[in-house]
Amino acid sequence: MSKSKALLLVNLGTPNKPTYFSVFSYLREFLSDYRVLDVPGPIRFFLVNFIICPFRSLSSSKLYKKLWKRNNSESPLIKHANTLKSILNDRLDDYEVFYAMRYQNPSLKNVINSIMQSNPSEIVVFPLFPQYASSTTGSVFEAFTTELSKYWVVPKVTFINQFYTNHKFISAWAKKLSSYDLDAYDKIVFSYHGLPNSHVDKVYMNGLCADRNCESNFNEENKFCYKAASFHTTKLIQERLGLNAEKCITCFQSRLTKNWLTPFTDSVLEELAANNQKKILVLAPAFTADNLETLIEIDAVSYTHLTLPTIAIV
């Protein structure tokens, strides 16, 4: 490596193939992480291997096949990672850019080994999650440090734990939204990936997230609360564009149970349709690359039963 430093981009992961067994393998690795499914180990093992994966892999593999088909038989997450890596390698003089997935491939273990073969003076670890969550950024940190600690020589490490307040991130979203006629839409829906309420409650030493009014109160205490960060992201983008706060809705998708962050995206869209507010613009500021959640789950096709004549996905 001619460049003296390494930049490691990390995203969540994707199945190697859109098949039942490949999806099973991905889900098993993902859900076996205690930071993702925070229940006692024996219960987690039973749920993952005998309840969740055997059944969910079947339905999920069908969705991944649909996703692959739309993207020339490849994972969009891998495609975007390769593109980003190539662009940054061309632009950064001092850094050799690598990317890894927290789950599946390319694995953190193999990519860290490739980095260490080049004896870098510094590794900058950049999890591609704008808002901190233990189940994403926290998990990447633990997995990365576990692997790196196996090496005798440990270089300087810089770890980026969240970046949603970075003005360039906000400007990028504002620029993208500016390409739409925002006045033509009844509502602008900011849809973030959901989390169990228990995950955000653990951010606080005392009390619960619900006690903090995280929808409008952003401070030092809740700066790593995913719910607060999500609402804050919406506010920053809304203010950058000079949008009326009443026009913007923050919500959360991909829930597994009712005990996840609310309001739920599907419920919000159903309510908007019922109230005859049918020109909707949807964006997903928790995602830095398209994947199943943005190309399939939020896709307009998913909401045809709502009779929304105009629903645009940013």
Language-model features: locations:
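Redox- and metal-dependent alpha/beta enzyme cores, enriched for Fe-S-associated oxidoreductases
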Residues: 197-245, 256-263, 268
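A short, acidic, amphipathic alpha-helical segment used as a generic capping/interface helix at domain edges
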Residues: 109-112, 257-277, 302
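Conserved small/polar residues in nucleotide/adenosyl-binding loops
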Residues: 304-310
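Charged helix-capping and loop-helix junction motifs
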Residues: 140-143, 263-267, 296-300
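N-terminal glycine-rich anion-binding loop in soluble enzyme alpha/beta folds
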Residues: 3-99
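Long, hydrophobic, well-ordered secondary-structure blocks that form the structural core
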Residues: 98-172
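C-terminal functional regions that serve as terminal interaction/effector modules
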Residues: 280, 287-302
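A structural motif corresponding to the C-terminal end of an alpha-helix
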Residues: 84-96, 151, 233-247
